[in-house]
């Protein structure tokens, strides 16, 4: 039983007016550790007991069985609990040492699937920093879902269909060069895409031409299909090279085109249920009863289907294929209205499992405060950015540890980890301004700072030649180690919070906090001092390294043993 549950149970024994779960949720962590480890505010009982909170706190402190705590004291309207440091540190260290990387593994999911729609770059366009958020948030959530006992299914819903392919075909036929595209596919295709968009602003006939080519593509015209397939194949080769660099993999690459033959069923279902109504020649579903003002546009007046039709087909396919417990869409916040419509249409169709679908939205990445745009050519391309991050990491490693044996591998882990960590430490609904120098810094709240704390611990353990004995009980009771013990003990709850909120930043902030607490401990403690407490201190280091490495893994970030 963890300490919060223990305290809630003790209070519940003498306070029938509150449920144990309610007491648990009311417990606070005092800002000053001199005021105890946990505190119960008595305000919540004042009305029911018709007594002043101070009097209630005093009464509770006297009646609680204090034998399981170092001390229980009333301070004003709070009951403050001082935990038994030696006993709890022994329990925590024993658990972490026994479990290793499986510490805090949970079984809520019982092997059920969670579908994750993530990354989803557009074919024939460069993989930019704008795509990074969906990729790294989705990848981190997959690790967190697995830690909670679910089986994640990572789906790269490629943007491999749409009018933009009509634009690209027109541009290629007008100005393209096969050899140039084969040599540098994404660069060349981007140039063509930017050029056609610029020229279409003054020449509307290009839009018409593009629409015609896309119609031919929908009708499986041979020339259009061959060009489309070529653009897709060349783009995927390049994307997969980047995914390998990021350490991200997928279970499915079924993109928009995959659902071309699955949309007629959606239209038939909507017709059969009497949900499709005509509006200005188009087919729509009214959603006013869900508080959604604009109807969902299912089919345009020219017969073309829309994103939502395709997403309805995808949702049905995924439910049938994976029978998901949850289905999440890691897509920018600007698509919020689309996903509200998607869920509402499925609900209207009678699919209550639409309640298990969540739009995991996120804010924008900017550069110098300006929004990034592929169409306008204002992009930060991921590949040169990753190369620059690795180079900067290599320079810092060279300065700190010139004799390091595997510098290239470590520089890669640090550079890539720095970019991913910086993104993930930001609350996902907030955007951030891209700043490579800040990302790769070894100081401050960064990935390299956390990685360096882990490498420092490994160095200490190597110097001491320490491996903990599984039949030994290690315990500590000094204030610095206690801060670390409390964080390690809280790790299972941190994972659950990150899971419940679809929020990797909770995990990233925990990793920063644990690294900071260890560095403070390292600065104030002679860890390798040859005294009776030495093995206890080393056991704490060992457990901290396990949890730091696991927290980083849940973020998709490596933890080098040397830096």
From Swiss-Prot:
It is found in: Cytoplasm. Pfam families: Arg_tRNA_synt_N, DALR_1, tRNA-synt_1d. One of its GO terms (biological process) is arginyl-tRNA aminoacylation. Its EC number is 6.1.1.19. Monomer. HAMAP family: Arg_tRNA_synth (MF_00123). This is Arginine--tRNA ligase. It comes from Streptococcus equi subsp. equi (strain 4047). The gene is argS.
